[in-house]
């Protein structure tokens, strides 16, 4: 019997491209004749914001039998739970954010000692962290940006866009005592009122394609997320021609270049970021040529995160693992 691959996935129904990638990995593997499944916890759970045609198995289904030659792929946030699922099956940990590795644990861990035989890392800096600090060999399988975020060349130059700045609140930051979002939101609200027709729009809980359309019709996106890997909304905005004004966020070191493909600030330099955002509003016409060049560069950067590149790396990895 052909061995199977199960992607353990949280029962979380809000839009999250991190969860979307779990589904898309399964979709890619199945298109290459790997018997792969999304594995949710509770029967009947589903998400409605993502377009993905994949079979879903459920942990509470007594008919599910994970065999010793099957592979369980576990996101880093579920790594502690993952060692209790699937008996003596093979295990791979899928790390999308190095900051979250230790969240499920009370002390530093070795993934190998926990029973994980290998790791998938979304970006080079994540691979480096895993191999230096968590005792596991990692393979980079890069993320990709959903193709419907990419605008045509005319769109990337900012034509027919609203003078609008998008922000995406992220759960957990305020609770963690990181107040940058509230500071920049209040400052931008005032700056937009003082510089019509500029508007600020906070976006949350919307379908993925609707987010893409908003980005393709907006000039800027502000992100003050600071504990990130891919920080998906930033490269999505780059693809859509919606120029990011953002923190590096740690993970951005792998693809952000200040004044070339984004306006980039060190983490927590919230007032410097606010100064630049206001300047972009006030001197928008004056900066039009510079902004057009940066949008083009941003789109080129985003284009390197293609589904084809993800597919190539993922299929090669599972081929090496014997699937």
Q: Model segments located where?
A:
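N-terminal pre-catalytic "stem/leader" segment of glycosyltransferase-like enzymes
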Residues: 1-71, 250-252, 264-265, 304-308
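Conserved acidic donor-binding segment of nucleotide-sugar-dependent glycosyltransferases
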Residues: 258-259, 263-275, 281-288
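Aromatic "clamp/platform" in nucleotide-sugar-dependent glycosyltransferases that forms part
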Residues: 226
